[in-house]
C-alpha cells in the first residue's frame, strides 16, 4: 500500500499526530484504477451496482457514453455492471472451537479495527508546539557531554546553544528553558549571582532574543545553581531553609531575567508565597506581560539525579524535603495549586512527570490554568539507557511517554526529548 508522508525533513510547522501515525496517516487508496464491465446481465437478475478495482489502465474508469437518466434506467431494468464476488470469510486456524457468538450489544474493538478509524477517534494528540526544550548552558566555548544524560550537553552559550536552538526551531520547537552551570567562584551562601544583570542567564537571553526575537524563553528562578550550599534557598546556621529572605532574593532574580527579555519566569524553589511576591516585583518594574510558570507540585523526588550532576547543584548537606513535596501526598498538590492561582501564576507545573500522572490529572480537573509537566532527567535517562541496551524501542517508548503526559492533561511538556521527538514527528531521525 502506497503512503504519502504528511511531514518532511524541512518542516518548520508540523501537524499533530499520534504515536503510531507513521503507519496510517495520509494513506492513499490502493484502488488505483476503476472500470465498468461492458457486458449486460439478464433483467431478472438484480444486483447492486459496484465498480471493480483494477491494477491496470490509466487510473480513470471507462465511460459508457450514457447520460445519468440512461444509467439509472439501465440499473432499474437490471442491466447492472458486473461486480466483484462477495469475499470469502477468512478461515480460522485449525482446531479453533466452533461456538455461538457472544450476545454483545457493544464491541469496542470495532472502533479499533482500522488504522483510519483509530486515527479518527484518537482523543489525544501531540505536536512540537507542546514541547519546551530544557537546555544546559555554561561559560565555556565547547559543548560538554553530560555522562548521566546521553545525548545532552552543557552548551557553550555563544555557539553550541545558538546552534541547538536553530535545530529545534527547524522542527517546530520554539520554546526553551535555560539552566546554567555557574562557576564555583561565583557561588555564595545567599546566591547573589542569581540577580547579576550581566550573569550567564541574562547574557544568554539577550543573545538569543537578538538572534531569534520570537523565541519563547522560560527561565528557572531558584538559588540552588548559585548557592554554595546547593539548596534552593538561604540556609540558616542550624540548617533551616529561610523562606521569606529567600523569596526576597528570588524577586530580584526574576526581575533581572525579565529585564534581559525572558518571556516566562519559573520559580522552582517551592518557597511559600514566592509567586505573589514575584508577581508584585515584576509589575512594580513594568513587566506586567512577563508570565509566571510556577513549579506548583514539585516533589522531593529521586528522579532528579542526572540533572544535579549536569549543574553540579547537589545539596552539600541534607535533602530538600522541608520545602519540596512528599511523594506520598496527593491532596497537598491542591493546596499549592490554589495558593499559586490566587497569587497570580499563569501556568501550573508538575514535576516529575510520568510518576505523577495522577497529580497532572488532578490539577487539570481542578484548575482552569494551563498545566505543564516536566519529564525530568531520571525519566529521560532511563528511556535512553533502555534503548542503548536494546531492552526497549527508544523511539516508541519516548513517544508513548510524551503522549501519556498529554493524555493526563499536560498542555506543555518540558522534556529533554523535545528535539528528538519533534524530529520524529516531522518524519525524520536526527
Curated annotation (Swiss-Prot):
Documented EC number(s): 4.2.1.24
Annotated residues for binding of 5-aminolevulinate 1: 308, 320
Region span, Disordered: 82-101
Major place of residence: plastid
Location(s), subcellular: Plastid, Chloroplast
Presequence range in chain numbering: 1-52
Transit peptide as UniProt keyword: yes
Induction field: Up-regulated by the transcription factors FAR1 and FHY3.
Biased composition (Pro residues): 82-91
InterPro entries: ALAD, ALAD_AS, Aldolase_TIM
Pathway annotation from the record: Porphyrin-containing compound metabolism; protoporphyrin-IX biosynthesis; coproporphyrinogen-III from 5-aminolevulinate: step 1/4; Porphyrin-containing compound metabolism; chlorophyll biosynthesis
Superkingdom, taxonomy of origin: Eukaryota
Ligand binding (5-aminolevulinate 2): 377, 416
UniProt entry tagged with the keyword Metal-binding: yes
Entry's cofactor comment: Binds 2 magnesium ions per monomer. The first magnesium ion is required for catalysis. The second functions as allosteric activator.
List of catalytic residues: 298, 351
GO BP of this protein: chlorophyll biosynthetic process; porphyrin-containing compound biosynthetic process; protoporphyrinogen IX biosynthetic process
One Gene Ontology cellular component annotation held by this UniProt entry: chloroplast stroma
Stated role: Catalyzes an early step in the biosynthesis of tetrapyrroles. Binds two molecules of 5-aminolevulinate per subunit, each at a distinct site, and catalyzes their condensation to form porphobilinogen.
Family to which this protein belongs: Belongs to the ALAD family.
Subunit structure of this chain's protein: Homooctamer.
Name listed for the protein in its UniProt record: Delta-aminolevulinic acid dehydratase 1, chloroplastic
Organism: Arabidopsis thaliana (Mouse-ear cress)
Amino acid at each position: 500500500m502506497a503512503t504519502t508522508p504528511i511531514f518532511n525533513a524541512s518542516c518548520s510547522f508540523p501537524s499533530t499526530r499520534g504515536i503510531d501515525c507513521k503507519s496510517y496517516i495520509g494513506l492513499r487508496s490502493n484502488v488505483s484504477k476503476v472500470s465498468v464491465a461492458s457486458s449486460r446481465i439478464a433483467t431478472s437478475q438484480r444486483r447492486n451496482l459496484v465498480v471493480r478495482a483494477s491494477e491496470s489502465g490509466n487510473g480513470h474508469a471507462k465511460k459508457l457514453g450514457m447520460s445519468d437518466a440512461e444509467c439509472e434506467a439501465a440499473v432499474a431494468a437490471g442491466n447492472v455492471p458486473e461486480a466483484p464476488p462477495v469475499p470469502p470469510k477468512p478461515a480460522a486456524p485449525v482446531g479453533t472451537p466452533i461456538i455461538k457468538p457472544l450476545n454483545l450489544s457493544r464491541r469496542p474493538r470495532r472502533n479499533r479495527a482500522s488504522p483510519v478509524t483509530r486515527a479518527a477517534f484518537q482523543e489525544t494528540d501531540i505536536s512540537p508546539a507542546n514541547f519546551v526544550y530544557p537546555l544546559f548552558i555554561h561559560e565555556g566555548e565547547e559543548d560538554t557531554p553530560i555522562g548521566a544524560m546521553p545525548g545532552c550537553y552543557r552548551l557553550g552559550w555563544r555557539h553550541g546553544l545558538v546552534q541547538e536552538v536553530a535545530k529545534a526551531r527547524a522542527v517546530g520547537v520554539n520554546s526553551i528553558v535555560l539552566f546554567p552551570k555557574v562557576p564555583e567562584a561565583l557561588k555564595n551562601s545567599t546566591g547573589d549571582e542569581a540577580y547579576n544583570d550581566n550573569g550567564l542567564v541574562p547574557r544568554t537571553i539577550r543573545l538569543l532574543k537578538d538572534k531569534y526575537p520570537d523565541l519563547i524563553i522560560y527561565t528557572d528562578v531558584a538559588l540552588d545553581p548559585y548557592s554554595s550550599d546547593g539548596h534552593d534557598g538561604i540556609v540558616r546556621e542550624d540548617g533551616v531553609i529561610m523562606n521569606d529572605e529567600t523569596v526576597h532574593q528570588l524577586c530580584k532574580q526574576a526581575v533581572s531575567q525579565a529585564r534581559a527579555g525572558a518571556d516566562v519566569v519559573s520559580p522552582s524553589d517551592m518557597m511559600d508565597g514566592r509567586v505573589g511576591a514575584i508577581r508584585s516585583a515584576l509589575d512594580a518594574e513594568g513587566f506586567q506581560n512577563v508570565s509566571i510558570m510556577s513549579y506548583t507540585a514539585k516533589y522531593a523526588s529521586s528522579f532528579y539525579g542526572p540533572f544535579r550532576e549536569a549543574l553540579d547543584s547537589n545539596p552539600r548537606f541534607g535533602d530538600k524535603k522541608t520545602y519540596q513535596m512528599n511523594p506520598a501526598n496527593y491532596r497537598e498538590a491542591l493546596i499549592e495549586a490554589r495558593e499559586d492561582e490566587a497569587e497570580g501564576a499563569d501556568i501550573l507545573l508538575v514535576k516529575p512527570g510520568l510518576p505523577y500522572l495522577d497529580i497532572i490529572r488532578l490539577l487539570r480537573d481542578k484548575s482552569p490554568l494551563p498545566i505543564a509537566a516536566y519529564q525530568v532527567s531520571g525519566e529521560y535517562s532511563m528511556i535512553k539507557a533502555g534503548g542503548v541496551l536494546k531492552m526497549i524501542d527508544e523511539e516508541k517508548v519516548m513517544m508513548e511517554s510524551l503522549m501519556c503526559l498529554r493524555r493526563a492533561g499536560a498542555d506543555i511538556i518540558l522534556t529533554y526529548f523535545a528535539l528528538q521527538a519533534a524530529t520524529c514527528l516531522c518524519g525524520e531521525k536526527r
